[in-house]
Every structure is written in structure tokens, then in C-alpha cells.
């Protein structure tokens, strides 16, 4: 889907993601469930 440097997340976007690091689902933030 969407990957690289944050994906859907990006600073608390879609589902309260931390942004940066991971891509679409999981990972170091971004996508679903980030660092806060």
C-alpha cells in the first residue's frame, strides 16, 4: 500500500500515529498505531 517515511501517519494523522519511521501498518510510527 503506502510505505516509506511515515505513510499514512505523519504526525498524528489517520489513527493517532507518531509519524516518521514506519510505513502503512505498525513500524516506528505512522500508519496504524505510532509513537503517540
Swiss-Prot record:
The keyword Protein biosynthesis does not apply. Residues 1-36 are annotated as: Disordered. Keywords: Antimicrobial, Fungicide. The keyword Zinc-finger does not apply. It comes from the Eukaryota. GO terms for biological process: defense response to fungus; killing of cells of another organism. Possesses antifungal activity against a number of phytopathogenic fungi, including H.sativum and F.culmorum. This is Glycine-rich protein GWK. The lineage of its organism: Eukaryota, Viridiplantae, Streptophyta, Embryophyta, Tracheophyta.
